Each structure stands twice: as C-alpha cells, then as structure tokens.
Amino acid sequence: MCNNGASMRLRTFLLHCSLAALLLWAAFLCAQPQASPPSAKTAAKTDDALELVKQGQKLNSEGKQDEALALYDRALQLSPNLFQADLAAGMALDLQGKYQQARQHLAKAIEEAPPASKVQALRTMAVSYAFEHNADEAAKYERQAFDAQYNAKQYADAAGTADELARIYLESGDSDNAFQWYQSGHLTALHQPNLSSAEKDLWEFRWESALARIRVRQLGRSAEAPKHLAAAKAILDKGDNPDQVRFYPYLSGYVAFYLHDYKTAIAELQKGDQKDPFVLSLLAQACEKSGDHAQALDYYRKVLTINTHNPTNAFARPLAKEKIAAVSK
C-alpha cells in the first residue's frame, strides 16, 4: 500500500509538471508576433521585382540603359534569384558594350531559369558573344538550346536555333560552319510531320537564301550566289508564302553588296525593312563604298536608335558605334 501511494503521488506530480510546461509553452507562443507566411511575402516581393523589370525593359527600348539597369538592380535586391532581372540586365549591358559584365548576369540567368525559359537564356548568351563575332563561344550555348529543342521533338524551333547559329558563323567570317548549321537547320525542319507544300516551300526558300549568302562570301564561289538568289525568287513567286516577300530586297541587296555592285545594293536595301539594324548597317557600308560618307553616317546613327538584343543588332551596333566614334574625335 505504501508503494502504491508513493507511485500515485509521483504520477500526480509528473502530470502537474507536464501541464504547467504546456501552459508556459502556450503562453510563450501567444506572446510571439504573428508573422505572415513566408511564401506570401516572397510572392509579393517577386511581383514588385517583376514590375521593376517591366519598367526597365521600356526604358531600355528607349535607349536609356543606365536607368534600366538601376531598376534591374533594385529588382535583384528584392528577388536575388529572379532570372528575368539578370537576363534583362545582361541585354542592357551588351547594348552598352560591357560584354563581360553582361555575361555575369546572363550566366546567372541560365542557372536560375526554369526549364521552360532555359532555351531563351542560352540563346541570349549566344547573342552576347555575337556582339564580338565570337561564334565558337556562341556555339556552346546555341548547341545546348538546339539539343534541348531537338530532343523534345520541337523541330521548327530547333531549326530556327540552328539557323541563328549559322548566321552568327556567317557574319563572323566562317562560311564553312555557317553552311553546316544552315544545312542542319534545313534538315531538322523537314523532320516535322505532315508539312504542307507551303511549309516545305518556306524552308526551301530559307535554304536557298542561306546558300546565296554563303556562296557570295566564299572565295571562288561568289558566281554561284545569283543562281541561288534566282531559286529563292522562284519559290516566292509561287505565292504560297506572301509574308516572306518582304525579305527578298534584303537578300538581293546582300548578294549585290558582296559582289561589289554597290549601286544595286543600295537600291535593293532601301526597299528592305528600314527598322532592321542589319539592313541599315549594310546600307551604311554600301554608301561608304560609294563615297557617300554623310549618308553612311546617317544610317549608322539610325542603327544606334535601335535597342533590340538579337543577332541583327549584334552585327550592326558595334560597327555603328565605331564609325560614329571615329568622326566624333
């Protein structure tokens, strides 16, 4: 009986201690400030950061890169792993010619990008190298993008990526690799199931367009370029790709320029897209070759009003900056 009584008293004591501990813990929790769920706070910061990126992109399109970069920096302070902010910062820095700084942001964007945006980030890095005509470095990123698209059976997208790399090679002076990648793009496009005759003609036009530009740049093969130009025109004349007709003056002007027929080049390129920096750059160069330096400078200045981050501007903008800087000295 004594043992039972002692045991009962011990259990009662322990129960009272446990109850007291629970009451103290509850009082402690009640005294703590009620915090918002971390996910809600993070989402709010991300939304604010994305709005800053949007505002920065508008400023960048207006040529206000410094102001845009200030907003991207604020966005990254709010959301340090926001790939859109790093991507946009890299683009703005490329337009300023600050390529090493740009690639630090773009490398971070590639790491941060979700799977659906990885290809975009990779291709943006490739364009960064196109600004310096560094096709081999650009290829490291374009190939990753191409492989991802090809493996996902996104053949039209993969063909576009291959053609983009081919153009970077061509405008960097490597016509052999340009041929290989244009050919890869053409063959990849034909993997698409159930292509219509118009779609087949589209890819044939692009292939003939590529061959015309490649041959006119190759030593000893420039005489072949007009044949491919005529083949491209014949495809357009079938009329099943009317939206491609607007590209023909650029193609014709390009071939004429590299055949040293600057009068024809100017006449054709003036019919082309006057908002395309590469067309404007070719016009400027053709005017220079013709001795019209004032008109050339006018075209170079127009190039610098365009703030897109794509291969055409990557080829045109650095040259325009160089030419304008030379006359400003």
Show which residues each predicted segment covers.
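Short coil turns that delineate tetratricopeptide repeat
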Residues: 46, 80, 114-116, 150, ...
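Alpha-helical segment of the N-proximal tetratricopeptide repeat
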Residues: 47-74, 78, 255
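Start-of-helix register in tetratricopeptide repeats
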Residues: 50, 84, 118-120, 160, ...
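Residue-level recognition of tetratricopeptide repeat
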Residues: 57, 91, 127, 167, ...
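Register position in tetratricopeptide repeats
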Residues: 61-62, 95-96, 131, 164, ...
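Conserved structural position within tetratricopeptide repeats
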Residues: 74-77, 110-111, 147, 187, ...
